[in-house]
Amino acid sequence: MRLLWGLAWAFSFFASSLQKPRLLLFSPSVVNLGTPLSVGVQLLDAPAGQEVKGSVYLRNPTSGPCSPKKDFKLSSGNDFVLLRLEVPLKDVRSCGLFGLRRAPHIQLVAHSPWLKNTASKATETQGVNLLFSSRRGHIFVQTDQPIYNPGQRVRYRVFALDQKMRPSTDTLTVTVENSHGLRVRKKEVFAPTSIFQDDFIIPDISEPGTWKISARFSDGLESNRSTHFEVKKYVLPNFEVKLTPWKPYILTVPSYREEIQLDVQARYVYGKPVQGVAYTRFALMDEQGKKSFLRGLETQTKLVEGQTHISISRDQFQAALGKVNTEIGDLEGLRLYAAVAVIESPGGEMEEAELTSWPFVSSAFSLDLSHTKQHLVPGAPFLLQALVREMSGSEASDVPVKVSATLLSGSDSKVLDFQQNTNGIGQVSFSIHVPPTITELRLLVSAGSLYPAVAKLTVQAPPSRGPGFLSIEPLDLRSPRVGDTFVLSLRTVGIPMPTFSHYYYMIISRGQIMAMSREPRRALTSISVLVDHHLAPSFYFVAYFYHQGLPVANSLLINVQPGDCEGKLELKVDGAKEYRNGDSMKLQLQTDSEALVALGAVDTALYAVGGRSHKPLDMSKVFEVMNSYNLGCGPGGGDDALQVFQTAGLAFSDGDRLTQTKENLSCPKEKKSRQKRNVNFQKAISEKLGQYSSPDTKRCCQDGMTKLPMARTCEQRAARVPQPACREPFLSCCKFAEDLRRNQTRSQAGLARAQDMLQEEDLIDEDDILVRSFFPENWLWRVEPVDRSKLLTVWLPDSLTTWEIHGVSLSKSKGLCVAKPTRVRVFREFHLHLRLPISVRRFEQLELRPVLYNYLSEDVTVSVHVSPVEGLCLAGGGLLAQQVSVPAGSARPVAFSVVPTAAASIPLKVVARGSFTIGDAVSKILQIEKEGAIHREEIVYNLDPLNNLGRSLEIPGSSDPNVIPDGDFSSFVRVTASEPLETLGSEGALSPGGVASLLRLPRGCAEQTMIYLAPTLTASHYLDRTEQWSKLPPETKDHAVDLIQKGHMRIQQFRKKDGSFGAWLHRDSSTWLTAFVLKILSLAQEQIGDSPEKLQETAGWLLGQQLDDGSFHDPCPVIHRGMQGGLVGTDETVALTAFVVIALHHGLAVFQDENSQQLKKRVEASITKANSFLGQKASAGLLGAHASAITAYALTLTKASEDLQNVAHNSLMAMAEETGENLYWGSAIGSQDNVVSSTPAPRNPSEPVPQAPALWIETTAYGLLHLLLREGKGEMADKVATWLTHQGSFQGGFRSTQDTVVTLDALSAYWIASHTTEEKALNVTLSSMGRNGYKSHLLQLNNHQVKGLEEELKFSLGSTINVKVGGNSKGTLKILRTYNVLDMKNTTCQDLRIEVTVTGYVEYTREANEDYEYDYDMPAADDPSVHSQPVTPLQLFEGRRSRRRREAPKAADEQESRVQYTVCIWRNGNLGLSGMAIADITLLSGFQALRADLEKLTSLSDRYVSHFETDGPHVLLYFDSVPTTRECVGFGALQEVAVGLVQPASAVLYDYYSPDHKCSVFYAAPTKSKLLSTLCSADVCQCAEGKCPRQRRSLERGVEDKDGYRMKFACYYPRVEYGFQVKVLREDSRAAFRLFETKITQVLHFTKDAKASIGQTRNFLVRASCRLRLEPSKEYLIMGMDGVTSDLKGDPQYLLDSNTWIEEMPSERLCRSTRQRAACGQLNDFLQEYSSQGCQV
């Protein structure tokens, strides 16, 4: 029996006053906006026949009514009523509730004349105070998957429902917060279907962490609901590893002797077991997650049917603990950490798993006494309720529970003992009789017999006594389900002669009184409650009565078992069916009403990489949201009636008594004290870390102990640590770790041997588990209308995995329902798996190793082949198959050699066929690149038909001697008549690729990130002002807003807590960058919806960087030249100060609220002070062009004094350079260090426009902005805009980010000022003579065209293009030439240098550092017994950080190729750079850089690289500066797919802000490396050499030329275009070619090469993959086809291929021999006849 009671307060009233009539007023303690408020009104003790009329309403005491009135009429026969009081938004606004600053309270008022006339009240009103909340309705947010990679797209849905769980169409506000808690996205939306869907992309630079999507009703700030998702770097696993302990706990009792046992299971995502080896290790983990590894417990076991068992005896465990000086009894509160790495045998893939929740406990059970009341009723039974759970969380049945109850009365005490076993669901109840005199009850409860769990509870009697108590006793202690009838019994306790006739009761659920009723009093009164959906997930039952004028009450919280939704949604597939990838699947959707069903399918492999922590939306989450409206606190009951009402979430008034006003929506939290343990179990390395107390110095120590991927002494590393406080611990710990590693031996006898080694926790990020994925992670993201039933046919993706399909329905009649997910396994009993490299080059040799998996019960023999495709050389031409036998339940790799011969994206298809239906085929795209390195060249011409000299142009073709000889290269020509719409429209800044399409630059740092925002804002502003959005596609406006929001989201990743910004995530803040962000985000306020307070904080930070003289300084500059003028000293300070002034001026727009006016005045004062500084410097006349331009613009923009503006203007104009119709600022006057040689504008219209450096463009753009503000659109502004317009690149941008941002801003302002609706035409004719004859194009354009506003044409690279121009509109013609070159002889390499070397896995000398001799990448066999040198924990787990995968065990000559990259950079001391430089390294084919190595270069205290990016085969390394001395960094790379005859690759080092300053080089694979050897089989090699020349050796064999085969070759087939007799002078290597320089000894024939004569030199090229070698000093007869390239002197050079005749000329001595005399004669006859007569056909 469960006794629930209520106690009335005792008041000293006369008996007559106790029975006076009353009006009782009940209501939920919180009023929710827009939700009807339930109000209970009761008439008590009124005389028979008396009728009471009145009304109830809500009001704000300071203003007036907040709701309409609701009337009531009561009498003794009808003495209670439950009303619904509307709370409209308009009334709440009008009564001023939203303006209340403190907790907004509202009064519920009952008004009736009866109160004053009959109830003797002073007024006609009676009321109670309620808390007002803008929370209303229910919102649910769903994402398409629980975890994402940086750079991935997040798709989400928001479901909006009202208080009754019915669809709501009210406006929603949706926000996204990043892992730093910063809002990065906000939008207001209207969802007519009540389901809003959207998506966004996580910035690729995002740090790991938890993001949040929140949604609320726009008018309800407190209706906020959110969902979280994880962002971390991962790739989907091929198989999942699970760790399952035999017992979910480890007992710390010393006498406990059982073994610690653990099962390891590895299964592919499609359910089949994995073959392989499991490597396991253990650690102790504390409450903060810090791990200390236990040496000696490491194991290496073989998987059998995907499983293995690990057992650790108690003695083994205690021995391991002894090494860290601790005892097993000290471990309670800690956890045993287990980590396992499984390497599968067939493919060598490695997956990992960890177990972090294996606690050390003193008992196998836990005790929960939360359902026991905290109030004692003397004289009544006390019900103790306990729930016993096992440590796994499941209920523990049939467990003995003992209770020792001590009853205290003053100094007397009595002890009662009880014992009982738990029932089937772990529950047990004890009824303890409490005598009337007892004041305190102390309970000691224990569960379990051998090692029991213990809990204590003390309850006390109420401080005062009343007339009696009310007991509520449920008939069944179990929680009811929806549809059940819940029966309760009511009875009085301590009232000998009750005088009341009825019990009154209420049912409260989801913050509303759902029912109010009464029941006649009997000796035992039973009440039945039908539990429907409105009472789920919980409700309070509150009962009360009045006795002697005092209320007696009690309450009980009833939890409803979570079950089904109100409606119905079922997802059905044929679960028994075995689906294959690509199959169609029937998905049945069933509802019980018309509904919208939102679907989604998730790859269950996501849960294996950490997605379990963020579970998908299910009914338990729905119930949780619904239950959040529950206003009650605790299981029910209270010390008195008022407390009973209050804890049930009710407000109550009876005229004399009043419940306390609720201050907030939460319940008071019980304070819990947690006992922390500090056990000294650290190994040597932990002791070293323990020497440092602060987190910063510990981080420095850990960084020092981390091994770099390159050789550096500890002293060299410490010298790079910028902070002195960090340098000492870094150096000390580095030397400590170096000594530990030096003492390691390479021949451990077993994996479990103890090692004095570096603790792995500082080497390993356990979440950094990178594996591969080729397939979508989710699909089926769609919303389907369903009317009770719908059958969908969907096609399954190619993944072999298990899909989990989710469904959420939304119905107008039944609300929201979440279906139970259904799983679909996609599997092939026989399938193959194929890996390809990112890209390869032509004629490199590739080894494919598809892996065949056979899960059938019998062996399978299949034939495997690669399908023939043009551009690939294959075994047998692709028709030759390998017969392979794959045993049952196993896997086997098959090797194929392939040589690509065409540069293209080729579909490579591998087919395996067996008998009957057995077989599989996989097709993937192989990206094949041309040899050499890409070279780009751009040319711009101004088209002006009104200028006679510009009506006809002749554009010469390219004749670069370095172009590869057989590349099919072209010149692309683009013509436009509308510069504004081309640059800022849907083909430029607002193109699908966004501003990224304007520039060919990376976007890694914060300043580069702003390129997403600034030009897009400029474009939007231009189109708004000129009203030209209608000329662009309709979706362009939305796309522009999306681009701006993406840029805003990305830049927030760099924000610091104080509002400032740094160039990198872990870099100190920069004044210049912070000002740049403030300017742009201030302009973007309308689109991004950012809070002004954040930008005000940013402006405040900038004020702190101002010096006394008014200038600004930058503690951590981003760039030193590109934006700050390329200047030193004063100029640099002036440019920075002007830049900050411009930003602060734009930032004034965010100071609109009253609270910010004081800071706004400080900003205005700062601008005035800075302007004085700028005016001083401008007056001195010593500034360079850039500083002058930005100063003039800043002073004009901020409306400084006229004198200052005039001085700056005159100074600037004195530096202007004018040529014809062009005006620009180039060389910087005033500082000799800053003079740049002048680049003139074109002398006449027929010449190309010279391309100026980035600094000139930016300076001129500031000049244009200044002129437009000062003079408007005038002649000078026209000339400046003309020059700037023709500096644009082929893509539409300029040189780098800053010049592009400022120039687009300036040109946009100019184009707005000069916008006209007048239409002008431009007619352009382009003609050229190419290989295929004469080609001509006529273009008719106008200045308002959008669709086809430009034409892009293609011409042969070497062809001359003739241009004729007509019409009356100006235009621009741009040419882009892109081709691959043999060599990169760049003159800038004299000033800027880069060198890349690749070696095999380096064994550094002892002098450098013994640490780096150790090879951490020993392979693992699939059977532990085969290891003579087993893999150690340090080898396995530290080595894992340096690789993405492990290959299967192979023979020694088949081990995967690992190489070490060393990148060295330096510069000439006289070369000035902006500071930031980027090294762009194209990796050798088939290689991938080790990400862990790159992260070490950027993330440790001795940072070597600011940032890195990987893009396909490219690795980009960002350097803050280029040193004047040679500095090198290194990283490892793995060749995941074998490639032979690897060709050289390119590397470029360039100044980011002036990309023309660069150095480009080739580098090659290690010499004598297998990377340079052939992999192909005989017929594949023969195919690959089919295009190679063949040297004729007929003369040596004495074969006579009876058939005239030389003449046939020369004149018939293939009919050559040249014939020379040459002497070879030398051989040289050029990229993927060999070059032979020769001297002509006889000219036999020529076609194009008219200058050919004896004694001239000619170059012959042959592919390096061909076997042909021409020996220096020997003579050869060479005949073939004319080349398309020329050498440096302009002479033709020739490619030697299969259409070339190459024959070594015999020596005179050889021809004198009798055997060769006839053959020599025939050769001489041919030479004479061919040279004199040529071909007679």
Curated annotation (Swiss-Prot):
Modified residues (Sulfotyrosine): Y1412, Y1414, Y1416, Y1676
Residues the record marks as site: Cleavage: R753, A754
Signal sequence coordinates: 1-19
Main location: secreted
Cross-link Isoglutamyl cysteine thioester (Cys-Gln): where in chain: C1005-Q1008
GO biological process: complement activation; complement activation, classical pathway; inflammatory response; innate immune response; positive regulation of apoptotic cell clearance
Domain (Anaphylatoxin-like): residue spans on this chain: 700-734
Gene Ontology MF: a single term: endopeptidase inhibitor activity
Domain annotation NTR: ranges: 1588-1735
Glycosylation site residues: N224, N664, N743, N1323, N1386
Disulfide bonds: C66-C95, C633-C667, C700-C726, C701-C733, C714-C734, C1464-C1528, C1576-C1581, C1588-C1666, C1611-C1735, C1711-C1720
SMART domains attached to this UniProt entry: A2M, A2M_N_2, A2M_recep, ANATO, C345C, Thiol-ester_cl
SUPFAM superfamilies: Alpha-macroglobulin receptor domain, Anaphylotoxins (complement system), Terpenoid cyclases/Protein prenyltransferases, TIMP-like
Subcellular location(s) per record: Secreted
A Gene Ontology term for the protein's cellular component: extracellular region
Propeptide, chain numbering: 674-677, 1443-1446
Induction: Induced in hepatic stellate cells by iron overload and by gamma-interferon.
One Pfam family recorded for the sequence: TED_complement
Keyword vocabulary terms for this entry: Cleavage on pair of basic residues, Complement pathway, Disulfide bond, Glycoprotein, Immunity, Inflammatory response, Innate immunity, Phosphoprotein, Secreted, Signal, Sulfation, Thioester bond
Post-translational modification: Prior to secretion, the single-chain precursor is enzymatically cleaved by plasminogen (PLG) to yield non-identical chains alpha, beta and gamma. During activation of the complement systems, the alpha chain is cleaved into C4a and C4b by different proteases depending on the complement pathway: C4b stays linked to the beta and gamma chains, while C4a is released in the plasma. The alpha chain is cleaved by C1S to generate C4a and C4b following activation by the classical complement system. N- and O-glycosylated. O-glycosylated with a core 1 or possibly core 8 glycan.
Note: C4 is a major histocompatibility complex class-III protein.
Function: Precursor of non-enzymatic components of the classical, lectin and GZMK complement pathways, which consist in a cascade of proteins that leads to phagocytosis and breakdown of pathogens and signaling that strengthens the adaptive immune system.
Subunit relationships: In absence of complement activation, circulates in blood as a disulfide-linked trimer of an alpha, beta and gamma chain.
Entry protein name: Complement C4
Record organism: Rattus norvegicus
Name of the gene: C4
